[in-house]
Amino acid sequence: MAIWSTRKVGLDNLRISQLLNFRGFDPSALVTKLTDPFSLQRLLTLNQSRSPPMVNRLKDSRKRRAAVVCRIRDTRDGWFSSLSSLTSSVIGLFQISVKLPHEPYKIQVMVSSQEQVQDVRQSIVELPSTFQYTCFHLEFNGKRINDFVELSEVEGLKADSEIVLVEDPYTEKEARMHVVRFRDLVGAAGDRSDNLHGLNAGLSLHDAVTAEAATDDVKEHSLSKYDIAASPSLETILPRAEAPLPKTVKSISLSAWNPPPYHLRQKGHLLYLQVTTNEGEQFQITSHVSGFYVNKCSNHKFDPLPRTTPKKVSAHSLLTLISKLSPSFNSAFEALQESNNKKDLLTTFPFQNAIPNSPWLVTPPSSNPNSHQADITRSQESYLVSGVDNAETLRDWNEEFQTTRELPRETVQDRVFRERLTSKLFADYNEAAARGAVLVARGEVAPLNPTEERDAQIFVYNNIFYSFGADGVGTFVSEGGDEAARVAVGKDVLGIKAVNQLDINGLFTPGTVVVDYLGKRIVGQSIVPGIFKQREPGEHQIDYGGVEGKDVVATHPDFVSVFEKMSKALRIKKHPVWDKEGKRHDLEGSVETKGLLGTDGRKYVLDLYRVTPLDVVWQEEPGSEDYPHRMSVLRLELVEAYWRSKMSQYVKAEVERRRAAKAQEDAANKEQPSETTESKEGESEEKAEEALDQERVDISGFQLALNPDVCSGQVPQTEEEKKQWAEDEKEVRDACEFLRSKVIPELIQDLHDGDVGFPMDGRSLSQLLHKRGINIRYLGKLAQLSKEKGSRLEALTTLLVQEMIARAFKHIANRYLRNVPAPFVASCVAHLLNCLLGADVNPKPSAEIDASLREIYPEGDFSFEKVTPETLRAEVEKQVTVRYRYTLETEWFSSLRHLQLLRDIAIKLGLQLGARDYAFTKAQLPAKVPVANGVNGASHDESKKKKKKGGDSKSPSRAVVEEKPVVSIVPDDIVNVVPLVKDASPRSSLAEEALEAGRISLMQNQKQLGQELILESLSLHEQIYGILHPEVAKLYHQLSMLYYQTDEKEAAVELARKAVIVTERTLGVDSADTILAYLNLSLFEHASGNTKTALVYIKHAMDLWKIIYGSNHPDSITTMNNAAVMLQHLKQYSDSRKWFEASLAVCESLFGKQSINTATILFQLAQALALDQDSKGAVGKMRDAYNIFLNQLGPNDRNTKEAETWLEQLTQNAVSIAKHAKDIQARRLRRINMNPRVTTLGTKVQPQVGQTAPEASGAKGAANASMDSRSIDELLKFIEGGDATSSRSKQKKRAAASNPKLRGSKKSSA
């Protein structure tokens, strides 16, 4: 298939996970190269002396894995047995030779028998020694090998066989691809302008952060001067300045003589190129079917024949040709490769199956005026990639989707191929659809129905059908108009994604993407055959479901079976509906869900926005009449949770019933005489075991499904129908009440108790709610419940209110942006942000608009100019009240967290802002905003300068200069707007099955088997999703945890590092997941002995935390504790103490001063103070911890006893130090001639005190006896009167006991 001519991601990853199990290798060395397309070849081919042992170890590994799989078959069936066939099939690794036409003339390649020949081709293309080959085929025994057959199908091919690489004649397409690849290889490609991917898309900061760890001062650590309370620095999330890469050629582009004239095309001329070398020489090059050669053309004379003087230069590859023309090329190219090799491969690896994340904050263009360089080829790339008419990229998306769904899925190999192809196809479609949607939003695509209203217009671009997510034709008039239509298309994507995940045989869905851009919501769908077909009179346009709203309903017997499967999986109840004439129609799904029989004979399901019932209780609440639409449906996660809850009740009732029946049976048996033979006893034991097995209840008798059409206008006709409809409605109401009375309160309680990770920003909050099945419209209810919990959930309340404000602002901004001409988008956004965030700087901001430019848009909507801070606040309050049924506090705008709110808004609108220190309050103005005018001196100098310069002629220019700081955000700060894409891509069920099987095995203490299965899941994830994908990042994280728990720390570090990079590039450099990835990496680095590196990662994570949340996040308590423990490990006791104190301050503010969590940190802080030679402070903190444990847990609790023991030891030690200090002071008073300055030096006293502890045992014992007779209070009084100097002899023993209190701080660390 043509689709598979795309670039393959790395090598066969199944081989990689096989190699991870070699017992003769350091696993971390292999894990570091998981994604390096060349490393595996180097490992297996370049070191010839080690190859045979590798193969032997692989055979041993195969035998061991085969035995494991046999055990699986004995205990389980289904997926596990399928996995065994996969394992045995991919295990056939062997080495072959490839004969080359040029140096090095032969290479060795390790291959798998299940690989396709094209995979071997790709491996060759990516090897450094064979970069120059792109247009070739492979031969074996003199016969050409088909690129799309597996190596096992090549007759006679075995280990140590030799295949031959034969260079092919070029076609125009191959020549263009060769030029594109050459530009990428030699670093001449430059930056590509892209309307889909924003600036710095796919950015990773990992290498820069790691470099900081490598350059840190040996004597200091990264937290030595860190200020926990300092304001966040935006530099944290910006890319670091890098040295320019070595330049290999000055330029390479298509020549002005291109394309070749007709008569020369007949002679094999394909392209004409122009190359300027580093030496400044310019060469005109002809791309010929035979290769490339220097021709006789100049800028003014056309002569494309080969140049013979000074010498004839030609080659099959451009790489070889340029190396002959430019003496410096080879050295520059090697330097470029070395420079690239210094970076982690993952940071530069191209995206294959995911859209890279575009950061919300970017380096402003003004900071680097030379960032945009002249490159004529940039404008030629579309031709180089797609050809003259762009026809090479036109694809029949719908046919590809449906053909892929029809691929066989019987074996695991079939499923791997099918899911791999599906993932790639969805990624390609999502990107193509998003690009087209941007053009539609910008008005650059002509509509098919230009006479219709704008919202009703439809478009076709790149074989994708586009429409607006608005009610252009009045379909949703009764549901809320444009608001309802906008919600419906979003729900439609979720419904299609759910059906795609079910993968029902015979049921097809169109490729669907929803794109939000510049206030518009655009739907892109693959064109279903027959959807535009004009039916015969009397025929419906739709074959199943509602045709024209709900007035006309169609049914078709062919759809019953496939819709039945879909509805059963989605918990949808089969139910009747009635058309406008009262005629009953029994449907398997909602009346809104439609079935279309395409002209290709396939059954398509459309409009899946009502796969779950309406939230009836929400719609009946006070305030529902003001809600913008009636599309408030329950989430699929909620329906599933409700089903599990009901099933659990069913199972419990069934078990109780069985046990009651069993009890009656046993009672009856006791009344009858029983035999006491051994055989009877054996039978009774067997029956007891059977009884235990029978506790497993058969749930096939449990049925629960919800009717999605209740409370949506259906009118039952008969009494029986009304009764059934009432029962359906009751079930739906129960599900709604389940959400309100159980799910939401449970989430609040889990957050209160610390049983779930605390959200950090709006995105992580939304993910948490959706995972629990809670709709975003319940933010207000969550905020009310959170506020009732008091200070413990104050952070959650703040986050919920901020999210409501951000979403309200998003709706307002979208309304204004929808009809704003493109050149004024930045002005509109900047003005609205100033009204929301910068009112303290300027209470009456005005929009910055070019009046002359405005005149050419007479129909543009410039109503945003009239917005003031007061009107915007009122509108935000109204939106929050209407959408979330929550009333903001009177002065809510005075307590905004400006930076965090700005970030949330930017992410929700797709904004990319220029990085600078934004001033949102007057207090920030003197320090930050006046930098623009270059007079950043002290304010008291201003009047003097005015007097010196004072002329009236200067004042106007001065006013202009100072006008920019008057507002917080100017239009130039809005650097770019990127589209937000919602897709329907399914997850890989095969990879998830392998992962789940591995988890089950680990839970059953089958460690080896569990590891094997999780490694298989890793290889499947990498194959199906590609390396750069959020799902792969999650698995890297889980696998790193697994390796850490099994004490394979180096491998854990490497996988955690990969998790960081992939998370940064796919989810964002400052996402909540990135912070967690850095924190995990820091723990693994510390466990591996790299504590200073770990502290660098913690510092970076804390800086990110400040940006996305602010200070005092509940989960930061654990992080600060970890940092303190790491600092203790480095013997940085003073710094460690500061971090424990900071952790204590946050803990006391969240949990109160008398909580167990606070006592736990007090316990640790007391130990830290003792290590820092502050015995008096240590005693005080340990006493506080002891009192809390005593009050909360009682005197017999282990925590209380241990705190008491430590308190006694610290008290006695402090007393001895205080007494010793007094003795020294008395001796010093007797030495009048002693220099008083020396008495203050404690460095000479400390060793003495430390030495007296073990030496003066007799006297010490007496002293201890006397001290023990006094109470701790009396001892503390004695200490208070003594010298503050303290030290103790037993500090080294503290290290082992520094962490045991963590076992009592489950809640504080959650």
From Swiss-Prot:
This is Clustered mitochondria protein homolog. Residues 375-619 form the Clu domain. The keyword Repeat applies. HAMAP family: CLU. Pfam families: CLU, CLU_N, eIF3_p135, TPR_10, TPR_12. It is found in: Cytoplasm. Residues 662-692, 931-960, 1245-1266, 1281-1310 are annotated as: Disordered. Residues 662-682 have a biased composition (Basic and acidic residues). TPR repeats lie at residues 1033-1066, 1075-1108, 1117-1150. The keyword Oxidoreductase does not apply. Belongs to the CLU family. Its main location: cytoplasm. Keywords: Cytoplasm, Repeat, TPR repeat. mRNA-binding protein involved in proper cytoplasmic distribution of mitochondria. One of its GO terms (cellular component) is cytoplasm. It comes from Aspergillus fumigatus (strain ATCC MYA-4609 / CBS 101355 / FGSC A1100 / Af293).
